[in-house]
């Protein structure tokens, strides 16, 4: 996949959520502007995608939209085309539908509360090779606990410290052909959109093995505060 393949994408960032589990931060800020290591979560996401080669962004806002609009006006993104769309208090799919009126070609749909150093070139290559209408980035679930293995006599045979489980979770970074967006329906939500594509056999998975965190709670935010430095390393203008 060439660099042009990535630069031709439009990234749709879903940043309209209230983030009720992140209070008191979200009493005065939208979830996407919750600080991580001195910068808003949205700043980290925009920087990573920009460094990876994405040049056009649509930021979908709702809760405390004016705060995000102000951040984008003051942000240092002169070489990037950033459009802000305020749909109010609606579902994610309605936000995407309002966004696609402003784009042509492929889109990359990202959750505004999720950081991951996804290799967009590899995602694009997997998407092209599969012939999918949409490719969803997935992440292997890890047990938060150490696992004990024992035999029928209850004799302990081994331990696994927080092992990887045989399950994969949806972390966004959803690469869509224009035809995939026909599965969107107003008033529905993301699970229905994804399930409709899965039922039609046009949705494929991309396995992300790098860094990932979704910031839903203060515990998540505190963990991300220490990990975000490791997430994104910038070398020679490329995201690693």
Predicted regions and their residues:
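N-terminal nucleotide-binding beta1-loop-alpha1 segment
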Residues: 1-27, 202
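Conserved N-terminal catalytic core of the sugar/cofactor nucleotidyltransferase
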Residues: 1-13, 35, 39-111, 120-122, ...
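Active-site metal-binding loops of divalent metal-dependent hydrolases
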Residues: 18, 113-114
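Hydrophobic packing residues within well-ordered alpha-helices of enzyme cores
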Residues: 22, 68-72, 224
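A structural signal for short hydrophobic beta-strand segments in well-ordered beta-sheet cores
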Residues: 33, 148-150, 205
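Residue-level signal for inorganic ion chemistry
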Residues: 42, 68, 99, 113, ...
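Catalytic-core segments of class I nucleotidyltransferases/pyrophosphorylases
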Residues: 108, 115, 124, 128, ...
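A short, conserved acidic/glycine-rich loop-to-beta-strand motif
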Residues: 130-140
């Amino acid at each position: 996949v060439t660099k042009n393949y990535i630069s031709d994408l439009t990234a749709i960032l879903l940043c309209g959520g209230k983030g009720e589990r992140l209070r008191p931060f979200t009493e005065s800020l939208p979830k996407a502007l919750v600080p991580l290591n001195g910068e808003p979560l949205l700043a980290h996401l925009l920087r990573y995608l920009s460094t990876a080669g994405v040049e056009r962004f649509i930021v979908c806002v709702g809760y405390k939209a004016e705060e995000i609009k102000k951040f984008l006006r003051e942000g240092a993104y002169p070489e990037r085309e950033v459009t802000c769309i305020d749909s109010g208090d609606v579902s994610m799919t309605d936000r995407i539908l309002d966004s696609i009126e402003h784009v042509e070609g492929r889109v990359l749909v990202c959750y505004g509360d999720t950081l991951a150093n996804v290799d967009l070139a590899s995602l694009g290559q997997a998407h092209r090779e599969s012939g999918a209408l949409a490719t969803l980035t997935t992440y292997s679930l890890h047990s938060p606990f150490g696992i004990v293995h024992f035999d029928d006599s209850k004799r302990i045979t081994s331990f696994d410290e927080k092992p990887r489980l045989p399950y994969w979770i949806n972390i966004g970074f959803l690469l869509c052909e224009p035809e995939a967006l026909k599965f969107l329906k107003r008033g529905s939500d993301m699970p229905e959109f994804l399930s409709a594509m899965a039922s039609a056999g046009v949705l494929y998975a991309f396995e992300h093995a790098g860094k990932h965190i979704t910031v839903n709670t203060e515990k998540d935010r505190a963990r991300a505060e220490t990990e975000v430095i490791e997430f994104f390393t910038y070398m020679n203008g490329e995201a690693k």
